Amino acid sequence: MDFHSVLKMAAAKPGSDGIAKRYSLAVGPPKKDPKVKGVDSAAVQAFLRKKDEESRRKETVEKRKKEDLLAKRKELKHDRKARAMASRTKDNFKGYNGIPIEEKPRKRKRSGTEEDQNDNMAAEGEEYMTEEELYEYSQSESEQEEEEELPPQKVPKPAPGKKPPTPALNFNDLLRLAERKQYEPVEVVRPVKKEERLRTAEELKELEFLERKAQKADRKDPKRNEQLVKVSKGSGDKYSSLKGTHSGNSKSSSTEQNGTIRKSSSDTGSRTEKSGSVFHTKESKKPSSAKDLGGKGSRPNVTGDGKDRHSSSQPSAASNSAFGRPSGSARPSGSSGPGRPLGGSGSSSGKSTGGSASGSARSVGGSGSGSGKPMGGSGSGKPIGGLHSSHGSGKPTGGTGSGSGKPTGASGSGSGKPTGSSGSAKSVRESGSGSRSVRESGSGSRSVRESGSGSGSARSVRESGSGSGSARSVRESGSGSGSARSVRESGSAKQAGGPGSGRALGSGSSFARPSSNSSPAPGKPAAGSGSARPSSSGTPRSSSMGHSTSNSSRQPSSSGAVRPSSGPPTGATPKGPSPRPGAGPTSVRPNSTSVPGSARSSLGSGPGRPVAASATGQLAPAKPKCTVVAETISSKNFVPKSINGHMNGIRTAAPPGHRPAMRPPGPPLPPITSSYKRRIDDDDDYDSEMDDFIDDGGECQDEISKHIREIFGYDRTKYRDESDYALRYMESTFREQQKEEARSLRLGIQEDLEELQREEEELKRKAKQLKAAKKMSR
């Protein structure tokens, strides 16, 4: 069946409608209503109406503004003219509307008036113009200026808020302040030691180098150094600077490297001495001073290396007096004699406590040389307890013992040291007569005095070997508490007879320093087993840790009693707050390091003992007086070195003749060994990108350096074995380079001239040869 017949059949079927269905090709109506042009809907018309109104309103506002501005401008113009005229008549013209017009640009105005004076003849119009010009600048700003002017007026008010510097205290105020401060505990700030990463050898070398550099700078500029070092109680410090002793007191903090800050409060500050009256300071009250890390209640802090350092707690008085006193004058112990030159006359320095100034013997307390000051309680050699009066100062130096008076070795005159009762306070007085107290002069054997009381085994061993300059002060603090024995070395210095002979200061005899053990002393708290013995002898020995306790315990009672015996000379016992650990007069400088002349007691745990009581006093006999610089250096240097000695509790003292001050500061340089040598590390230069670099060999280095050596005479292996450290010092400075350049320039010019001369000679020679040749040819 073909398609045609099928269609026919379908059409013929009765069920089918007659209309064939087709897809309409007509386009349907649009989905959106078409816009009708020219017709505004009501909403649109309302919107347009609103817009028109707004624009009209804006215009009116602008018009009004414009009118206001024009009116203002007109007014200002008139004002300006009127003001220009008014300024000529010096009227105070307030604007027409009553608002004063700010005349800000004063300078401009002045220049305008000057112009007026210069050109009196100028036309008025011109003058107005100048005024207008003047004003034109300020007109636009005039309103701003009025607003700006107000704030400046407010600004000045805060400025007065700064308080004017407080007026300097006068001396009496300082004394009062010192009295008040001496009982206040001082906080000791323990340095926080944080773990540092291990450093490479290179870094260590660098640090060492920088340290040395800084120390050199300090040596050159001691004053700056002192300022850094001075951590003094406020008042003490001011006072000390008044006295001019500051150089000394700054010293005490020398061991700052160890990290504990020693308060070098100048003893002067606290040594408030009201002419005659004696103030008793209660040492015991100063817990801080006693504060000691060692665990013994009073032991001064022991820094890591075992060095007792009398931490800052030291009462201000103590430290300064000890070393604060300029070498020239030993202020006898403590304040009493500040002005008195030690060396002065043997007698003066020898002032015996008893007041017998005879000869050079210096009673313990009055350290003629300043170093003799008895330490802490024994302060003036006065027995610490109440006895001080009886045998303390009263005891004539020579007197064997008005005290308990057992003259141990030296016939009565020698040492009248009452051992028994005062026990620790035994003031060993050197007899005024000059006999050496233990007086075994030639033998040099030491007489050992045991102080009677059991607890205090402080025996002051006085090595009187007359000749032995180096009597070594060995102070082992036995148990640490009781037995600190102060070995006093009378050293050669103790030559009784010659006031000048022994001590550099010229006080003839060495000082007897009472080695008072604090414990036995009646006045002393039991705890004070540590001896407060001043180690003032020729080499201040820092007492071993043992006496640590004495520090704090430093006799409270004694405090009252202790009067520096030096007092007698002045007539009133100066009341240095002697009870201070430093026993006012004696300064306890824990580091004896500062003592220049004497062997430095190894940083002594100084607390109890005035180390080096007179910093200058103890110079080795022959040495010149110590200078500020030397003291500064000596005080700072030795900290690191004596560590070993401290650990064992043994203080090693250098012989008195030896001046530590001369040693260069800083830890000793390690020898330059092969470990320092520079190494050429090829690995450091390795670069992975260079692996495929083709090296065609080139000339070998030795070949090249051989030529260089021939031409310039330079050997490149010359410094191969030098350390970086050494090479650092070979670098030339800019000035040296310039000199070198000038020199080479001179040489270059010279060589050029010689070259020119040679060339001229060559030319002449050639000319001659030519002439000769011509003649020959003819």
UniProtKB/Swiss-Prot annotation:
Coiled-coil spans in chain: 44-83, 193-221, 735-778
Biased composition (Basic and acidic residues): 50-78, 190-227, 270-286
Protein's cellular compartments: Nucleus, Nucleolus
Region (Important for interaction with DNA) location: 1-665
Protein name in UniProt: Protein SPT2 homolog
SMART domains: SPT2 (SM00784)
Molecular-function GO terms, alphabetical: DNA binding; histone binding; histone chaperone activity; RNA polymerase I core binding
Subunit structure of this chain's protein: Interacts with histones. Interacts with a heterotetrameric complex formed by histone H3 and H4, especially when the histone tetramer is not bound to DNA.
Biased composition (Acidic residues): 114-135
GO biological process: heterochromatin formation; nucleosome assembly; regulation of DNA-templated transcription
Composition skew (Gly residues), residue ranges: 336-357, 365-384, 395-417
Important for interaction with histones, as annotated region: 666-778
Gene Ontology CC: one annotated term: nucleolus
Role description: Histone chaperone that stabilizes pre-existing histone tetramers and regulates replication-independent histone exchange on chromatin. Required for normal chromatin refolding in the coding region of transcribed genes, and for the suppression of spurious transcription. Binds DNA and histones and promotes nucleosome assembly (in vitro). Facilitates formation of tetrameric histone complexes containing histone H3 and H4. Modulates RNA polymerase 1-mediated transcription. Binds DNA, with a preference for branched DNA species, such as Y-form DNA and Holliday junction DNA.
Biased composition annotated in UniProt, kind: Pro residues: 153-167, 662-671
Domains (record comment): The acidic C-terminal domain mediates interaction with histone H3/H4 complexes.
Entry-linked PANTHER family: PROTEIN SPT2 HOMOLOG (PTHR22691:SF8), YEAST SPT2-RELATED (PTHR22691)
Segments of skewed composition (Low complexity): 312-335, 385-394, 418-493, 506-559
InterPro entries: Chromatin_SPT2 (IPR013256), SPT2_N (IPR054552)
KW Aminoacyl-tRNA synthetase (keyword) present: no
Keywords for this protein: Coiled coil, DNA-binding, Nucleus, Transcription, Transcription regulation
Disordered: region residues: 1-21, 50-625, 639-685
Naturally occurring in which organism (per UniProt): Xenopus tropicalis (Western clawed frog)
